[in-house]
Design a protein with these regions (language model features):
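Positively charged, amphipathic and often flexible ligand-engagement surfaces
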Residues: 1-279
């Protein structure tokens, strides 16, 4: 956070909720819907760690993107983030919660959150992504014999993502949006929705984002047109960051498609420069 602000790298930071405490406790609270007396002390420590991050971000005038995790621990995270939005999203939208659109229930969740905040002065921060744990989610659902929370096809996931975009822009006065996608069609849709709502390209209500080193053709094109663009740089131990990136490549076909296109564009640029040098 200090590095980003000091060197004007970004106004956003990201953190993984389970880095703040026990995954088992997040799972237990998500399942039970309450904190048992025996877990109160440990849960309060987790809440305090969240607060330390949000307080530091407020001092630095930065924004915090809270990562989404597996469905069986997400409810506790959602509830904790929601409670903190009520506290911190007053002066500006400090906290953004991540919604994974590959879960078929997330559009309904988005509408529920909107309804809860409706009529208040609180602005809802949303980081909208497709999701990164598809194989893990489906595997667990099969093993434990319950219905998978994941959309049955990529087409349905795309519909879920794009419908969430449409809902947010329809109610853009109540939202601040951070769009994390390598999908060209979804990025184009967001641009069209901004035009429909007569928003400036540079509106601070909307940010576009791709992973650092991936889909640069999308990032550069958006930035050239004046849209707000951020490149996500995963930070952490190599043994954790590499699997993180591999999951996103394996489970997001848009990245694979974009990689092929980027290679094609790079080859064209190399050929163009060769011709320039020959002349």
């Amino acid at each position: 956070m200090e590095e980003s602000k000091t060197h004007s790298i970004s106004d956003f930071i990201v953190f993984k909720p389970t880095s703040m405490g026990s995954i088992k406790l997040f799972e237990k609270i998500s399942k039970n819907g309450y904190v048992s007396s025996k877990d109160t002390d440990e849960w309060n420590k987790i809440k305090k760690r969240f607060k330390l991050i949000f307080d530091a971000a407020k001092v630095k005038q930065m924004k915090v993107l809270v990562d989404a995790e597996e469905s069986w621990i997400q409810k506790a995270i959602d509830d904790l983030v929601f409670d903190n939005m009520l506290i911190y999203n007053n002066d500006y939208t400090l906290i953004y919660n991540t919604i994974q659109a590959y879960r078929y229930d997330r559009l309904d969740y988005l509408k529920q959150i909107h309804q809860k905040f409706n009529g208040s002065h609180i602005k809802i921060g949303v980081k909208l992504v497709r999701g990164a744990y598809m194989q893990k989610e489906n595997k667990r659902a099969r093993e434990l014999n319950y219905k998978s929370p994941i959309c049955k096809s990529k087409v349905l996931t795309d519909e879920s993502f794009n419908n969430s975009l449409k809902y947010i822009f329809k109610n853009i006065n109540d939202f601040f949006l951070f769009i994390g996608t390598h999908n060209e069609k979804s990025n184009l849709l967001a641009m069209k929705l901004m035009q429909k709502e007569k928003m400036e390209n540079s509106s601070d209500k909307v940010w576009f984002s791709q992973l650092y080193g991936m889909s640069d053709n999308i990032s550069f094109s958006l930035a050239k047109k004046g849209y707000n663009v951020a490149k996500l740089i995963p930070f952490g131990p190599v043994k954790e960051v590499i699997p993180y990136l591999m999951r996103r490549i394996e489970e997001n076909t848009s990245i694979s498609e974009q990689t092929n296109r980027e290679l094609s564009l790079i080859r064209k640029e190399i050929e163009r420069r060769k011709k320039v040098n020959l002349n």
